[in-house]
Amino acid sequence: MSGPCPRFPFCGFDLKAEIVRIAAMEPNYSKLAGVLTGFSTNLQKGERVLIDAFDIPEAMVVALVRAAREQGAVPFVNLQRARVSRELVNGIDDEQFETQAAWELARMQKMDAYIAVRGSDNIFEMSDVDPRKVSRVMRAMKGVLDYRVNQTKWVILRWPTPAMAQQALMSTEGFEGFFFRVCTQDYGRMIEGMAALEKLMTATDRVELKGPNTDLRFSIKGIKAVACGGRHNIPDGEVFSCPVKDSVEGEITYNAPTVYQGTSFDNIHLKFEKGKIVHADGSNRGRLNEILNSDAGARYIGEFAIGFNPHILEPMRDILFDEKIAGSFHFTPGQAYEEADNGNRSQVHWDMVQILSLIHI
């Protein structure tokens, strides 16, 4: 070999071009890290923050560490890889479940804030894992999740990957540009604009949802509405509440695709009586009902939310984006949030999205 070659012909990878691309992206990394540490979690001097990094560039992790320190906070980092996680879950036993959950909870209890950035080269990485093991992991980790949601300042976002660009039917470069525009927009201004809807939903009793194969009626009386503008999710743009647990009657067909526990679902159709899902159909019907049978609360609704991010217009099989689609709502089987609580408890929290129905409140 006469010398180092920046191009590897066996895979078409251009090392020099990739270095240039990463260098060009670093200002975006710094800006996004500033949003997450400054606006979303509002880190203060001396606060401990856990940075959970799933399959994301090292440069973004470094940007988050630096941004946290600029806020005076103390950063801790947990690096995770999807293929490693899959292998661990595949062979896990009860003793390891308990040890892992206890260790994760002890660590979380030392934290004041939590930032998770989740990338994925393959959203179906867990699709061939025994569903019973996935459910067992979720049950074991529920205490960690509950503590993180209710006792820390937290924010979660996806990381733009070629796989996500494919889901969105966009080029990788085009999707990256879209991602950083959406994730670094002026969320303070968005919060101001949501106040009227939050007030209306807080004062509302009856809600009716009508659309193709959809006719739902329920009450949200006495349950708080919460405006979400970049504090917990990036991207953001929704106001959520929750139905009175036994008030939901009727049926709904979700017209946005959804991926949950590594399985893709389309055209989910649910029927309700006295708040409970009494019939569930759609693609992967067997797996759908397995999830809804995970526990008693999985067949009741834990969230009703209206989405309105003006930059997000089409579904892309990523719920952190899809639940914010302008003109959409999500109606979520499973766990209710404490901020808007109907008392439903479950290891499941499955945001399912419908676009462009008629909403009467």
Task: Outline where the language-model segments fall.
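Dual-mode signal for accessory low-complexity, basic/Gly-rich regions
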Residues: H279-G343
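Short, glycine-/Ser/Thr-/acidic-enriched flexible segments
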Residues: I56, S120-N122, T161, I223, ...
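Active-site bordering "gate/hinge" segments
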Residues: A23-G250
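Short, positively charged and aromatic/hydrophobic N-terminal segments
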Residues: K16-R21
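Oxyanion-binding "anion nests"
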Residues: V239-A280
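Conserved small/polar residues in nucleotide/adenosyl-binding loops
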Residues: I359-I361
